[in-house]
Amino acid sequence: MPKSWPIVISSHSFCFLPNSEQERKMKDLNFHAATLSEEESLRELKAFDETKAGVKGIVDTGITKIPRIFIDQPKNLDRISVCRGKSDIKIPVINLNGLSSNSEIRREIVEKIGEASEKYGFFQIVNHGIPQDVMDKMVDGVRKFHEQDDQIKRQYYSRDRFNKNFLYSSNYVLIPGIACNWRDTMECIMNSNQPDPQEFPDVCRDILMKYSNYVRNLGLILFELLSEALGLKPNHLEEMDCAEGLILLGHYYPACPQPELTFGTSKHSDSGFLTILMQDQIGGLQILLENQWIDVPFIPGALVINIADLLQLITNDKFKSVEHRVLANKVGPRISVAVAFGIKTQTQEGVSPRLYGPIKELISEENPPIYKEVTVKDFITIRFAKRFDDSSSLSPFRLNN
């Protein structure tokens, strides 16, 4: 690991804790806002991680103040009250009805998706082909997993993303000096060669397999439409393996007693090609456009689609990957299911050697390449190192950098 990378607290070397020990660990966390030294932060992060109970475990103790490892910097928190909801910008809602039966409707849909991807980087879709009862059962499956008995759930707590197809954790990484998010997550690796269903918990196994199949098919359709919007043949993005890597994330955001002090998910952009998100009625998702935070409202039956960093890179900035976040809320739990299409990093030969750069058909004298070609390994390594600074996540890959 490069020396410049932040410290990562890994949990899979810690022991499981009995309930009484878990309660003691929870009490060890400091619940008063204060500036933490690195040593204090490290100690409190370790105490939190060792419980394997996540944010839900903290809430279940009956807290009225959040632990200080969750309190974000004032410069970030100030923006919550300043920008929330104060914009006339509306995220497009695109109806996919008639997509496969009417060529004229398909052309209109392609045009709308292309425009939304260029201007907003986000759009919502309705009549997308995933039945409402399947969506409802997927949300319920995420809820059941996170709300099941702690002793069962704790067995899946891990940060070993290289050797497990299913795991649960709280926060992707725990880093001294970086505020934790008010969120727990179950992660499922659902690549093109599907894992053994027996690796998934009983409480959500069947719906995980069913929903992921629906979303995989929808992803292939969206990559077709995005290819056409770029003036390419429909299977161009699929042939670039944009749909090979698939991860399903079941986020659980407990009610927060002090939502003004933390975030459900901090500001970030997605690293892969495309994300398909299902959010519940609580809402809280915001995207950053024209230096304003714009609410992405809950629409019954709709799915939120967003362009991710690699798709911006290979389209040479034609499509935009924009930063977004999720606000914490006194109401909860909020549940969302994100399916990220990204790089399938592992092949039979090891790490994929494939280079990704601007698509040749999109390059001309008038539109020269903005980005250098980059390997999968370098993209992941460099982007992770840039994860917690304020510069663009794609800036290291620009040719003029």
UniProtKB/Swiss-Prot annotation:
The keyword Transcription does not apply. The keyword Iron applies. Residues 242-345 form the Fe2OG dioxygenase domain. It catalyses: deacetoxyvindoline + 2-oxoglutarate + O2 = 4-O-deacetylvindoline + succinate + CO2. Gene3D superfamilies: B-lactam Antibiotic, Isopenicillin N Synthase, Chain. Binds 1 Fe(2+) ion per subunit. GO terms for cellular component: cytoplasm; nucleus. Its EC number is 1.14.11.20. Keywords: Alkaloid metabolism, Cytoplasm, Dioxygenase, Iron, Metal-binding, Nucleus, Oxidoreductase, Vitamin C. One of its GO terms (biological process) is coumarin biosynthetic process. One of its GO terms (molecular function) is L-ascorbic acid binding. It comes from the Eukaryota. Monomer. Belongs to the iron/ascorbate-dependent oxidoreductase family. This is Deacetoxyvindoline 4-hydroxylase. It comes from Catharanthus roseus.
